[in-house]
């Protein structure tokens, strides 16, 4: 029962991930059909959250071993996180729609800077969904590196130097992500 809930949550995570990727693409090229698809996927994620939440609460009322009880508790929190990620797809879509409606376009530099941010978001979402699906704690521990690095770049103004930013961001990201796990992480 817990394994089924984990699998369904992984499917929910994938829908949220795809929705954000599609919504980000709408800031570059508006497409009414794709926009509707993003809305539909977000609605499906909401349905997953409702159904999984109900199922997990019922499951938690049963007598479970310690590991299953912890898994159910984690899943209850995780479905909310994935639902919030999916909500961001609609926020991105709404911004893209406003840009399309008002015929607002990014400058070349702004597009390059946005691409760095989008690449980082895609990397985080890919790692997050992959780590969750595989239940890989080592991979999950690497997810936080990318947003922290990106935040540091934004704070220091590096994000404003688009051509340098992309090269430096990827160099630092790859260096940080390639570090070997500590003996404690190896299990």
What is the predicted function of each stretch?
Residues 1-176, 180, 184:
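Cytosolic, long alpha-helical scaffolding segments
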């Amino acid at each position: 029962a817990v394994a089924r809930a984990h699998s369904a949550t992984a499917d929910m995570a994938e829908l949220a991930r795809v929705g954000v990727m599609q919504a980000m693409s709408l800031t570059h090229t508006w497409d009414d059909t794709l926009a509707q698809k993003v809305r539909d996927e977000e609605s499906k994620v909401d349905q997953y959250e409702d159904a999984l939440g109900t199922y997990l609460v019922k499951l938690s009322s049963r007598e479970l071993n310690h590991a299953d009880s912890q898994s159910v508790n984690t899943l209850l929190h995780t479905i909310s996180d994935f639902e919030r990620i999916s909500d961001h797809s609609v926020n991105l879509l709404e911004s893209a729609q406003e840009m399309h409606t008002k015929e607002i376009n990014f400058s070349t530099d702004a597009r390059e800077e946005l691409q760095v941010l989008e690449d980082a978001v895609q990397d985080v979402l890919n790692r997050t969904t992959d780590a969750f699906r595989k239940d890989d704690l080592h991979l999950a521990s690497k997810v936080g590196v990318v947003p922290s690095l990106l935040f540091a770049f934004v704070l220091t103004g590096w994000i404003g130097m688009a051509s340098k930013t992309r090269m430096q961001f990827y160099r630092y990201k790859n260096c940080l992500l390639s570090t070997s796990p500590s003996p404690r992480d190896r299990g």
